[in-house]
Amino acid sequence: MKNVFNSKGKLVAGDSPLQVYPSTPPPAILKCRDIFSNCLLLRLLAILLVIIGTGTSKLYAQNAIVTENAKPGNPSSEWQISGAGDLSIQGFATDISYNKGETARFKIKTSARAYTINIYRLGYYQGNGARLQGTATVTATLPQSQPNCLTNSSTGLLDCGNWAVSAQWAIPSTAVSGLYIAKLTRTDTGGSSHIVFIVRDDASTSDLFFQTSDATWQAYNIYGDNNNGRSLYTGSGGKAVKVSYNRPFLTRNGGGGGGPQEDWLFNAEYPMIRWIEANGYDVTYTTNVDSDRRGNLIRNHRVFLSVGHDEYWSGAHRAYVTAARNAGVNLAFFSGNEVYWKTRWENSIDGSGTSYRTLVCYKEGSTGENTCNGKCDPTSNWTGLWRS
């Protein structure tokens, strides 16, 4: 059945969802370079070129995204915050993503004697942009004292993984994959902030596989618990060559070397999420981290979407995406400055040795910003420009 779009680019209800080429004709690689301005028409044309095919369409009502977005959303006045939020209550998830049915755990630093944690999923939801999914349980005795984050002066790494767990949320086994935010709100002052994490569906064979640019979120993140934070660009004592996922995000405030208009999810990922879900696409979500540690799952989908400021890719990340393309998966780059710096991953330094918690990029060579003008990564791996 032919799909019909209204004047706002929205798929008219009742039509079948867009279809995807299974493996022939050859996979397409599409790019929307101007991700930081309004290129909706180009995005739409690219999606149509990649996705419209001759395969058997799924029934519109069977699409989990359509069903989820039909539920009443919550207005942005309820879930949104200004910038990175209140610095007196900040936290992070113990992983950037969790499979549905797992438990998300949060480490939070605050002097508050009481606070709430509401969990929202980002989407369209009648234009509200998010829907309340539940509340997390505070497991720590409050007020909770957290130690100073661990640091390494030679690399600039700051790792707050030594903080104790403060709260948790049991992700329902029926949860819909997506970008989720835990909104932390102090009971006394009303100060609030966000913890961002992704809910995966590792068994999914959805048409679209949406990858966030979380490595870039961290590359520009300058969080430090004692005015000692560093990003891969700047910070107290100079730039870092290693940054940790065991930190709250201050990226939305800027100051980490780029700008909040370019380097955070509400710039590019969030508008794309709203558009995709408003139009009923069959989509599940993944991360830069997961494109490396479970990149084999990319082949289970018809289209791989790079969305946002997708600047930092590891070697395994690129190898998995290339292998998926060669196997017939279409690639669509709704991103800018993508696949620019080559990275590698290390374990955390918090004593747990948790994998995929440290992003490493020495910016080797002499081309690009903040380079070390040579081979400076102590390993044999190159962590400089991909194009050098």
Question: What label would you give each PLM region?
Answer:
Residues 90-114, 119-125, 130-134, 138-188, ...:
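Ligand-binding face of N-terminal immunoglobulin V-set domains in extracellular IgSF glycoproteins
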Residues 43-54:
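Bacterial N-terminal signal peptides
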Residues 66-88:
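Proline/serine/threonine-rich low-complexity linkers at boundaries of modular beta-sandwich domains
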Residues 145-161, 167-176, 261-347:
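Helical hinge/lid and interdomain linker segments adjacent to catalytic or ligand-binding clefts
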Residues 61, 113-115, 119-123, 132-137, ...:
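Aromatic-Pro/Gly-enriched surface loop or interdomain linker
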Residues 1-40:
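N-terminal secretory signal peptides that target proteins for export/translocation
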Residues 339-388:
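An acidic, glycine-rich "communication" segment
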